Amino acid sequence: MFRFNNVKNIVMKKIKYVIYKEGKYYVSQCLNVDISSFGTTIDEAAANLKEALQLYFEDDKSHLDYLSISEALIGETQLYLK
């Protein structure tokens, strides 16, 4: 069981992310900060992203890059390029 020694320093961050398939891997992309990861399954991609985010937020100044997102939608469009 994980215990927090100093609960006053614990901050919860709500994280929004998307997962998409690229080749044989699933890519997990965080929308709040520029962090991504991947895995061979959706669950693995999500778990790997969570681990990467925990490492990222260990930096005392990483919270400055955090963008709070209350709602996220996925859209699709077509572009005609020359």
Where are these regions (language model features)?
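Short, charged, surface-exposed hinge/linker loops at domain edges
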Residues: M1-I15, A47-K82
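Intrinsically disordered, low-complexity segments enriched in Ser/Pro/Gly/Ala and basic residues
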Residues: V27, I35-S36, I69
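Residues that scaffold the ATP/ADP-binding catalytic core of kinase and kinase-like folds
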Residues: Q29, F38, Y56
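A short, exposed loop/beta-hairpin motif centered on an aromatic-Gly-Thr core
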Residues: V33-I42
